[in-house]
Swiss-Prot record:
Belongs to the lentiviruses Tat family. Keywords: Acetylation, Activator, AIDS, Apoptosis, Host cytoplasm, Host nucleus, Host-virus interaction, Inhibition of host innate immune response by virus, Inhibition of host interferon signaling pathway by virus, Interferon antiviral system evasion, Isopeptide bond, Metal-binding, Methylation, Modulation of host chromatin by virus, Modulation of host PP1 activity by virus, Phosphoprotein, RNA-binding, Secreted, Transcription, Transcription regulation, Ubl conjugation, Viral immunoevasion, Zinc. GO terms for cellular component: extracellular region; host cell cytoplasm; host cell nucleolus. This is Protein Tat. The record marks W11 as: Essential for Tat translocation through the endosomal membrane. Transcriptional activator that increases RNA Pol II processivity, thereby increasing the level of full-length viral transcripts. Recognizes a hairpin structure at the 5'-LTR of the nascent viral mRNAs referred to as the transactivation responsive RNA element (TAR) and recruits the cyclin T1-CDK9 complex (P-TEFb complex) that will in turn hyperphosphorylate the RNA polymerase II to allow efficient elongation. The CDK9 component of P-TEFb and other Tat-activated kinases hyperphosphorylate the C-terminus of RNA Pol II that becomes stabilized and much more processive. Extracellular circulating Tat can be endocytosed by surrounding uninfected cells via the binding to several surface receptors such as CD26, CXCR4, heparan sulfate proteoglycans (HSPG) or LDLR. Neurons are rarely infected, but they internalize Tat via their LDLR. Through its interaction with nuclear HATs, Tat is potentially able to control the acetylation-dependent cellular gene expression. Modulates the expression of many cellular genes involved in cell survival, proliferation or in coding for cytokines or cytokine receptors. Tat plays a role in T-cell and neurons apoptosis. The gene is tat. Residues 38-48 are annotated as: Core. Its main location: host cell. It is found in: Host nucleus, Host nucleolus; Host cytoplasm; Secreted. Residues 1-24 are annotated as: Interaction with human CREBBP. It comes from Human immunodeficiency virus type 1 group M subtype B (isolate ARV2/SF2) (HIV-1).
Amino acid sequence: MEPVDPNLEPWKHPGSQPRTACNNCYCKKCCFHCYACFTRKGLGISYGRKKRRQRRRAPQDSQTHQASLSKQPASQSRGDPTGPTESKKKVERETETDPFD
């Protein structure tokens, strides 16, 4: 380490600032320009304001699409399609026929 003049502010120490200014180029050399460029360009991390993305507009026939959704058959519930009452009756019949030892 080189001795640093104690009268200099920390941001003016030699080696604390790169010799060239940061730019918008994303080449390999510019991505490794300084710590800030590496995190922003190399890693893609930025803590600034997020750009507002515009929503995609719905096509003009969106009403027909909604109508086709309502015409679809309702989804059936999962499980035994015969229903819980018949399955209970089956269990009762099986328990009655099994002999108790």
